[in-house]
Amino acid sequence: MEKAYRIKRNSDFQAIYKNGKSVANRQFVVYTYKNRDLKHFRLGISVSKKLGNAVTRNRIKRAIRENFKVHKQNIIAKDIIVIARQPAKDMNTLEIQSSLEHVLKIAKVFNKKIK
């Protein structure tokens, strides 16, 4: 994913945590914040060290990033932070995708219906 689509600075994360809305399911917590300055979404991913070793954490992050790449055209211009919870470490890529799509629909980040 290009740099323009990433949230990297701690101050950005803190602002979204403070001012954004959160939605959760068992596997993920999603914070969203309407960013009026950008014409596209920005994504921040947080996977705690409690979830496992670096291989496990990176696998989860890759699956989350891939899901956003697939739906790139259908996502509203918002700042989005995805936090992985403990059950996500035991899921395969397809399960992560369906769970993430579920929580993103609840968070209303899609601009049209997703199957």
Curated annotation (Swiss-Prot):
Cellular component (GO) terms are: ribonuclease P complex
Parts forming coiled coils: none
Q: What is its EC number?
A: 3.1.26.5
> What keywords does the record list, in alphabetical order?
Endonuclease, Hydrolase, Nuclease, RNA-binding, tRNA processing
Gene3D superfamilies (UniProt xref): 3.30.230.10
GO MF annotation, one: ribonuclease P activity
BP terms from Gene Ontology: tRNA 5'-leader removal
Reactions catalysed, semicolon-separated, are: Endonucleolytic cleavage of RNA, removing 5'-extranucleotides from tRNA precursor
Q: Does the keyword Protein transport apply?
A: no
User: Which PANTHER family would you find in this protein's record?
Assistant: RIBONUCLEASE P PROTEIN COMPONENT
Function as written in the Swiss-Prot or TrEMBL entry: RNaseP catalyzes the removal of the 5'-leader sequence from pre-tRNA to produce the mature 5'-terminus. It can also cleave other RNA substrates such as 4.5S RNA. The protein component plays an auxiliary but essential role in vivo by binding to the 5'-leader sequence and broadening the substrate specificity of the ribozyme.
**Family membership noted in the UniProt record:** Belongs to the RnpA family.
What subunit structure does UniProt give? Consists of a catalytic RNA component (M1 or rnpB) and a protein subunit.
Annotated protein name in UniProt: Ribonuclease P protein component
Tell me the gene name.
Answer: rnpA
